[in-house]
């Protein structure tokens, strides 16, 4: 998941008094927060899921050890949260500045066959693609709204590249066919893309899960 800097400017209340900015959330709390969001959406804990679906004992054991594929892993926030609960994670990231990544490669080079060979079929896929060209602050530099389709057509080379990447990720998801998948992005332009239509979407805010920031996020 992309990291966002907290606004360094203190908050000015309506009475004119200056209050300090909210404290930064620790990495451990961030990991727990992301797992809580993920769990809420797909009705975790897994033991409850298993009971509700009336599966056999072998499947129960399999679901107690989920295989998670984390794309655009970065600091591995969601991966660490799953690992802390005993699940198996395979992370993919192109930037070698990030540590403890299973596969360093351009996502465009990654194939379903490669994932299956090296990791197996994932139960869950979590993808956090670049949000730059969809963010409210920068979208006018990268995209223009198509009046006929409503799509935010790319006008910059980087936006065109990002669209190819995102559609490649959707292809990977279709080929790997996980039980659950998540495409995480700050609430912005991605939800308006034609290739995102028909995909279930939840908008969550960090303050719903105990953080001081709102930070609306589409998953």
Outline where the language-model segments fall.
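Conserved active-site and SAM-binding loop architecture
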Residues: 2-3, 7, 12-17, 26-219
């Amino acid at each position: 998941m992309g990291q966002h800097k907290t606004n360094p400017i203190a908050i000015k209340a309506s009475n004119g008094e200056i209050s300090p900015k909210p404290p930064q959330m620790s990495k451990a709390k961030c990991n727990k927060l992301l797992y809580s969001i993920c769990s809420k959406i797909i009705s975790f804990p897994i033991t409850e899921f298993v009971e509700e679906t009336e599966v056999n004992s072998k499947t129960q054991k399999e679901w107690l050890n989920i295989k998670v594929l984390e794309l655009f892993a970065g600091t591995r926030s969601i991966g660490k949260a799953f690992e802390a609960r005993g699940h198996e994670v395979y992370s993919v990231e192109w930037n070698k500045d990030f540590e403890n990544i299973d596969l360093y490669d351009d996502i465009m080079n990654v194939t379903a066959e490669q994932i299956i060979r090296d990791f197996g079929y994932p139960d869950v896929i979590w993808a956090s693609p670049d949000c730059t060209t969809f963010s409210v602050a920068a979208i006018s530099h990268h995209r223009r709204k198509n009046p006929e389709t409503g799509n935010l057509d790319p006008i910059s080379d980087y936006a065109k590249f990002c669209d190819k990447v995102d559609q490649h990720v959707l292809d990977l998801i279709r080929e790997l066919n996980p039980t659950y998948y998540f495409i995480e992005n700050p609430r912005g332009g991605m939800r308006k893309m034609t290739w995102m239509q028909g995909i279930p979407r939840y908008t969550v805010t960090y303050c719903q899960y105990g953080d001081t920031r709102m930070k609306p996020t589409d998953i």
